[in-house]
């Protein structure tokens, strides 16, 4: 396994739905007399960049250099998003403003480490081809020096069929690794990429299977691998870990390494960032999946949108509690 220090040499493009994660932190002491709902006493508020921006933040935390591409609305929230990004470790980003569009915001009310409610503000219509061309031009100018491309699809309208097809072709023509966190039931949109990282429900629904059915992971994994001809497929399964499928190989399951699960918000972002960075650094699919699994186990133990860091991951690996899972680390 390549050392985590090798991540600092990586340059990775992230294209996807950028959003603002807003948290209202408080406490609940009573039920409202007006309706059977809790009354939250607001104690604190915080803002963090989410969605594709959280993928980029995880890459930066790992020491890689992310190049983030996304869109925002022509509203005050878009200005807030720019301000949050400017204060983050993401130093290279192009967030294109689109007239008449709302900046995607997810507002979460949290009390006693529990989500009380989430409020979404968004525009989900696909962007125009003209807007897509602006992004594609910027991407084409730097892609020669890039090690990998991550596509983070939250189905908020950025990744139109036009943009997706052109982006995949551009990356593959340059022989870049393309890793996708997919959305929706039609995974054929991602044909031509190297790897996708859906969760169990997404994989099952894309294969027209019941997510709760027996061996939904195995059946959907084999179906997706066959139809898309991927190099690999990593299906995340929450508290049950994740399963890696590779072309011509038996599925490889990894049990979750999480000691406590407080919040799964952004865990998929951590998985794809770590997995893609590990692949770009020269690791094989199994070692990359092991690192992604370890990173996910760390972040789900924290409340709110959070990111992995190289030091946190290194400390986790150095403890030796899971040495049997990382024999190749010292090979």
Q: Model-predicted segments: where are they?
A:
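Active-site metal-binding loops of divalent metal-dependent hydrolases
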Residues: 18, 154, 270
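Conserved post-catalytic alpha-helical subdomain immediately downstream of the catalytic base
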Residues: 231-232, 257-320
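Substrate-binding N-lobe of the ribokinase-like
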Residues: 4-5, 33, 37-105, 316
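Conserved phosphate-binding/catalytic loop of the ribokinase/pfkB sugar-kinase fold
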Residues: 87, 94-101, 108-143
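A cross-kingdom feature marking charged/low-complexity
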Residues: 317-331
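Short acidic, glycine-rich surface-loop motifs adjacent to enzyme active sites
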Residues: 145-158
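Positively charged, low-complexity intrinsically disordered leader regions
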Residues: 1-29, 328-329
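Conserved phosphate/ATP/ADP-binding segment of small-molecule kinases
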Residues: 156-251
């Amino acid at each position: 396994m390549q050392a985590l220090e090798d991540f600092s040499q990586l340059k990775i493009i992230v294209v996807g739905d950028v959003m603002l994660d807003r948290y209202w932190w408080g406490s609940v002491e009573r039920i409202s007399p007006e309706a059977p709902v809790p009354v939250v006493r607001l104690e604190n508020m915080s803002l963090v960049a989410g969605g594709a921006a959280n993928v980029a933040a995880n890459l930066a935390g790992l020491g890689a250099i992310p190049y983030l591409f996304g869109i925002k609305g022509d509203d005050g929230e878009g200005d807030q998003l720019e301000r949050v990004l400017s204060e983050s470790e993401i130093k290279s980003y192009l967030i294109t403003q689109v007239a008449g569009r709302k900046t995607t915001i997810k507002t979460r009310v949290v009390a006693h480490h529990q989500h009380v409610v989430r409020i979404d503000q968004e525009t989900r219509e696909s962007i125009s081809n003209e807007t897509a061309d602006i992004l594609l031009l910027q991407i084409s100018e730097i892609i020669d020096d890039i090690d990998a491309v991550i596509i983070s699809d939250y189905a908020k309208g950025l990744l139109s069929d036009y943009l997706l097809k052109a982006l995949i072709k551009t990356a593959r023509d340059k022989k870049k690794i393309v890793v996708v966190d997919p959305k929706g039931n039609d995974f054929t949109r991602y044909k031509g990429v190297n790897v996708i990282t859906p969760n169990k429900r997404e994989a099952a629904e894309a294969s027209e299977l019941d997510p709760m059915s027996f061996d939904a992971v195995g059946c959907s994994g084999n179906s997706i691998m066959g139809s898309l001809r991927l190099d690999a497929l990593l299906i995340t399964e929450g508290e049950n870990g994740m399963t890696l499928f590779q072309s011509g190989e038996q599925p490889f399951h990894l049990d979750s390494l999480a000691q406590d699960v407080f919040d799964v918000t952004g865990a998929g972002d951590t998985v794809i960032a770590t997995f893609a960075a590990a692949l770009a650094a020269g690791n094989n699919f199994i070692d990359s999946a092991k690192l992604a699994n370890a990173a996910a186990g760390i972040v789900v133990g924290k409340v709110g949108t959070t990111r992995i860091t190289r030091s946190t991951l290194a400390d986790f690996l150095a403890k030796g509690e899971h040495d049997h899972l990382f024999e190749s680390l010292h090979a």
